[in-house]
């Protein structure tokens, strides 16, 4: 079974986002993965906005050698492709209008993705306002959609579905003060057919449980682990 099929069939799963930019040494990364192996985290997502190609390959290869969890590449740019991942999210930032992230990065990476043989999953990437100036907004030079603009969020998600994207990733941004709202999730789940990934600003167990109850397929957590390593120990099991 492909990783996409797993994501489509499962709900309430937990993903750990690892940004190699924030991992200062291999020993720190090793400790993180070893702890993750003993936790109920289901997937590892790896990617960052400033990682050099060689470093990225090395990180993916190292994590693959010690991880018991599937590795999903969450690329920050066209250079972040590696055969050592289990799947790659082929992202299109459809919430913005910067052509570099609508088509240019995809064109640059296409041959490398094919040559790697990695499972490639077309993914709508929709940036929502998490009430912070996120690194995604800075790097992509795009403006997040306000979370009160539900009709625009829905129309954007449906456009991605019509473009043939298999996954929808709603992103409030790393360290967001406000995560993707439950109202937004409920609307998207009721009106779209794509498997749903939600990330950004998720720091409370209650938020995770509420998202699980609404049928989010994959809940991505990053900053909460960075700020509180014991977060591994209190993660809730799927409802």
Which functions belong to the PLM regions below?
Residues 1-23, 109-122, 129:
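N-terminal amphipathic alpha-helix/helix-capping segment at the start of soluble metabolic enzymes
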Residues 7-8, 37, 57-68, 161, ...:
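Surface-exposed amphipathic alpha-helices with a cationic face
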Residues 12-29, 74-77, 127-153, 198, ...:
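Active-site mouth loops of central-metabolism enzymes
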Residues 14-19, 44-46, 71-73, 88-90, ...:
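Hydrophobic faces of well-ordered beta-strands that scaffold small-molecule active sites
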Residues 46-51, 87, 91-102, 172-175, ...:
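Glycine-rich phosphate-binding active-site loops on the catalytic face of alpha/beta enzymes
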Residues 73, 77-91, 190-221:
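Catalytic cores of alpha/beta
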Residues 80-161:
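Conserved anion-binding
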Residues 139-184, 226, 231-232:
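Glycine/Thr-rich beta-alpha phosphate-binding loop at enzyme active sites
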